Amino acid sequence: MLLTPTELERLTLYTAAELSRKRRGKGLRLNFPEASALIADEILEGAREGRSVAELIGFGSTILNTDDVMPGVADLLPVLQVEGTFPDGTKLVTVHQPIRPGKLPLAVMPTPGEILSPNSDIQLNNGRPIATLRAINTGDRPVQIGSHYHFFEVNKALDFPRETAFGMHLDIPAGTAVRFEPGELREVQLVQFGGTGDIHGFSGLTNGNLHDPACKRAALERARAQHFKGA
């Protein structure tokens, strides 16, 4: 046989689908790869039989339901897309929610990927030293500061008491940021870095431990020498 890569993939899909049918026949509930392979195989066979795209879109959501699959599989498969060869060419069949609700009640358990958190409010940076200060952007372009940037070393055009900000970052959720437009004055709350206190990189002012007084003095001297406002 001289098979193209697409035809080889089709045989792999068929093998997975046959395994799914065998396990389903034993009464086993299918996992994500098994369910995906079975539905895709049925759609491709329908295309080979000459059925239309519209017909197969509807058919794709009748093959399996939540009674046939493991808990959470339906949530992992909100959309299934498979490219089939039809009498008038190759077309993409898109089936939304291919696994519809069955008759059995769904198990009350976490959904794959669900974030579980306590019922109470989450305390951010609880117990660490904090400081509140006012800073103004004296530059002519916006300055955006990420949650864990060493605030002492931010853009030199930002004017604020830098010594107060040594060893601290913005007290905001990780991955968020605060933006200062040109001329904007705003109040921010800072919190001390956790861990060992070793700070390296950023603007190259610190490169040491925030708990070391000598490191702080040297960082302030570098900031003044490089004309960081507020130093």
Swiss-Prot record:
Superkingdom of this protein's organism: Bacteria
Keyword Cell inner membrane set for record: no
Localization annotation: Cytoplasm
A single GO cellular-component term on record: urease complex
Keywords on record: Cytoplasm, Hydrolase
GO molecular function: nickel cation binding; urease activity
Region (Urease gamma): 1-101
EC number: 3.5.1.5
Keyword Hydrolase included in the entry's annotation: yes
Region annotation Urease beta: where it falls in the sequence: 102-231
CDD domains: Urease_beta, Urease_gamma
InterPro entries: Urease_beta-like, Urease_betasu_sf, Urease_gamma-beta_su, Urease_gamma/gamma-beta_su, Urease_gamma_sf, Urease_subunit
GO biological processes: urea catabolic process
Record field: catalytic activity: urea + 2 H2O + H(+) = hydrogencarbonate + 2 NH4(+)
Pathway: Nitrogen metabolism; urea degradation; CO(2) and NH(3) from urea (urease route): step 1/1
EC category: hydrolase
HAMAP family reported in the protein's UniProt record: Urease_beta, Urease_beta_gamma
Subunit structure: Heterohexamer of 3 UreC (alpha) and 3 UreAB (gamma/beta) subunits.
Record-stated family: In the N-terminal section; belongs to the urease gamma subunit family. In the C-terminal section; belongs to the urease beta subunit family.
Identification of the protein by name: Urease subunit gamma/beta
UniProt organism field: Pseudomonas syringae pv. tomato (strain ATCC BAA-871 / DC3000)
